[in-house]
Amino acid sequence: MSDTDLSTPRVSRRDYVLILFALAMGGFAIGISEFSTMGLMTQIAQGLQISEPQVGHVISAYALGVVVGAPLLAIIGARWPRRTLLLLLMVFYALGNLASALAPSYHTMLLCRFIAGLPHGAYFGVASLVAASISPPNQRATAVGRVLLGLSIALLVGNPLATWLGQIVSWRWACAAVSVLALCTVAAVAARLPPAPDEPRQQPLRELRAFNQPQVWLALAIGAVGFSGMFCVFSYLAPTLTAVTGVEPARIPLAMVAFGVGGVLGSILGGWLFDRMQFRAVPVLLVWSVVVMLTFPLAAQSGLWVFVSIVAVGTMGALAPALQTRLMDVAAEAQTLAAASNHAAFNTANALGPWLGGMAITAGWGWTSTGYVGAATALGGLLVYALAVWQERRQRASLASC
């Protein structure tokens, strides 16, 4: 049994709810910071006197920070108590976003967004471990899903508010608001999450042993491949709606809301399903993803059904809490690094999906071809899952024969 598996919560029910709320609030802040840049692209370009494609580089700098920071900070912080590490990561995040708000030039902004992205994956990894550690064993994935719910709510509510604030006042105030939310998370976690003196301490080199586990790599690969279809469709959603469905540009924000609703449902469903089915929940979610992706091109022909389909696309986020919990189960003593690396895998999916979708569109297959590309990547995730099951059975058979 891993150190996240405790028979009973070590906090009161009231504190349990408040801790999960505080951890989700940190995810809410991160979600606003990650996604609001897209909605404020024009304002940032005007404020820094750069082109919108250059703002795209700013977005990429943040994503690069996530990929680099997730394993790096998990290894560096391995020897610290998780409570301390959580607090430091959110202070770091607040400072990174404050620096972004004050950035005077394009190159400074690139650096600030890279720095702001560094704590992203490590925070979600450690927050998920903390949420699981205070939960009964049969509610671990549900608790992880509630932490990740912050990201979905940010997409649903936070980003429209941040975009509105950036348009009415300045995009810099949106960055500053994220810093305030991050500091509120620090205060809430410090007030409600008690120290855990019996928590096992790790050594940085021991954390690296996570990558000696084939099941860790396979779980990360499922996320990087199987999750990319969602990003493939989402990245080209606006032009698909206007060019294929005939949706007026003024209604595009409704599509973002629909996607956010799906994300909220997915975060809840993914954790609930994994608590009941364990790793067997993953192929169920991937098959659902295949169905959703294959029906999207058909739904895109209807102004009504396309919004139903967009909600369904958002529910594909159910993979996140399922895979996050799977990594906790297979990482042995190197849980911090494995859990943090999950978000590096998701950012890989965020890069892979739009790239594959762009290739299909450029080849002349049309805007709705993103659905078929997404179905193919979900099938790829199923193949990786099958490989993981085969490898796990082979390992058990080998141990049994010894």
What is each stretch, according to the model?
Residues 49, 81, 102-108, 246, ...:
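Helix-breaking motifs and short loop linkers at transmembrane-helix boundaries and internal kinks
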Residues 68-107:
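Conserved MFS/SLC helix-loop-helix module at the cytosolic interface between two early adjacent transmembrane helices
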Residues 70-81, 266-278, 361-362:
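Helix-to-loop junctions at the C-terminal end of transmembrane segments
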Residues 92, 96-99, 107-116, 304-312:
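Paired small-residue
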Residues 106-108, 136-194, 240:
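Helix-loop-helix hairpin linking two adjacent transmembrane segments in secondary transporters
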Residues 112-150:
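Cytoplasmic helix-loop-helix junction between adjacent transmembrane helices
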Residues 280-323:
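C-terminal transmembrane helical hairpin of 12-TM major facilitator-type secondary transporters
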Residues 330-366, 374:
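A late C-terminal transmembrane helix in Major Facilitator Superfamily
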